[in-house]
């Protein structure tokens, strides 16, 4: 198989859950579309980011609503690749139990709900599931304990589903982004000292862009990664090894 064929997604049907903002999910969706796939995106917002309106079919979806998730699965005739990207933080409030539970419900339970709902589709297509974890699965965070705990659990869920579903021909992998320039990180990036500290520790000397995550996700979903399952790729410019 040629290198070009390894990354040709022509005819593949992709669902990116959590792509209503111009961030990681949207970048992943655009990359799959550019590689020939048919792509549907979801998000909590009524509409996608302005630059994506009209580019993708869009479904407003609350991943904490099991009936809504199952309903979307029932309306989806075929799926080859599912990307779970929906996530939130409650910065500075996650020590409050209600906020903690809500973050975990979206980030962890939402990932699990969506994976289970689309399991029959992925089994039928011998497809791929890609979960978006985080560097905070490894590092503690005094302000975001729920986010870190939920993303660590997403990594473990990825390993468990990889084992459980391998016999069905489904590969399950994850990526763990580092500091990325998105709307979600805007508050952190408003502090010049914090930006400088991240750049100083990161061997590659910069924050990542959403497109930096899209390429590795396409790799994991491609035939080039056909013997990989249960893995989580750190995409953080070397931050986690510095």
Give, region by region, the residue ranges found by the protein language model.
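Substrate-binding pocket helix/loop in short-chain dehydrogenase/reductase
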Residues: 91-104, 198
């Amino acid at each position: 198989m040629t290198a070009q064929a390894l990354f040709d997604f022509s005819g593949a049907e992709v669902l990116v859950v959590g792509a209503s903002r111009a961030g990681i999910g949207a970048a992943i969706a655009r990359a799959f579309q550019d590689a020939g796939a048919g792509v549907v995106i979801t998000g909590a917002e009524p509409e996608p980011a302005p630059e994506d309106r009209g580019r993708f079919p869009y479904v407003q979806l609350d991943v904490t609503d099991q009936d809504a998730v199952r309903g979307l699965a029932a309306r989806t005739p075929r799926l080859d690749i599912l990307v779970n990207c929906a996530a939130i933080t409650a910065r500075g409030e996650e020590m409050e139990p209600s906020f903690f539970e809500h973050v975990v419900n979206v980030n962890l339970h939402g990932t699990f709900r969506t994976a289970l709902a689309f399991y029959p589709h992925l089994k039928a297509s011998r497809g791929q599931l890609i979960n978006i974890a985080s560097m905070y699965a490894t590092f503690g965070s005094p302000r975001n304990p729920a986010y870190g705990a939920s993303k660590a659990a997403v990594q473990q869920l990825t390993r468990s589903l990889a084992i459980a579903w391998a016999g069905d021909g489904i590969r399950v992998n994850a990526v763990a982004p580092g500091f990325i320039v998105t709307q979600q990180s805007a508050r952190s990036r408003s502090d010049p000292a914090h930006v400088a500290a991240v750049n100083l520790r990161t061997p590659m000397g910069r924050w990542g862009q959403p497109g930096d995550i899209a390429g590795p996700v396409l790799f994991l979903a491609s035939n080039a990664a056909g013997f990989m399952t249960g893995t989580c790729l750190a995409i953080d410019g070397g931050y986690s090894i510095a």
